[in-house]
Amino acid sequence: GKYMGTVDIKDTTKEELSRMMVGRDVQLQVDKKPAHPGDVVLDVEGVTIHNDQRKKDSVKDVTFQVHAGEIVCLAGIEGNGQTELVYGLTGLEKLSGGKITLDGKDITRESIRQRSKDGMSHIPEDRHKHGLVLDYSLENNMVLQRYWQPEFQKGGFIQSDKVREYSDKLIAQYDVRSGQGSST
């Protein structure tokens, strides 16, 4: 830190105080259009997840809706059930009660693969530990959730050329930086 000065709060504006804190003028108000959320895309009703090790519920009777166009954040102190709730929604953890509806379809008892087919995705909080296989190439990591789809296999065998074609497309589309392309 660097000393920027001393001011009397009652004689100082928010703009002046923020300028002293940041070192430049800061726009304190953002002009934006009012949000117009769409239809309900995720409906969570009374979700409960029991933790057998702790012999109590880690998530109890959680209910909320997410509308098209909304971004929802789950916040709280570590250990208060956010991870378990996400695991329950994505199928990684079994619910002991409640219902999950995605785009009007009850997915409560669906497998992870079926939830993925239905359009649900999950970005884990630790991407390196749970989001990819570090020993796999970039192209193999890019098809982890879809290797079973017909376009990537034939007769039960992975079609490497199709996997590479798909991963090269994603690398170009999202400007992915890698040492040697998709085989990295």
Name each model-derived stretch.
Residues 1-184:
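Glycine-rich phosphate-binding loops of nucleotide-dependent enzymes
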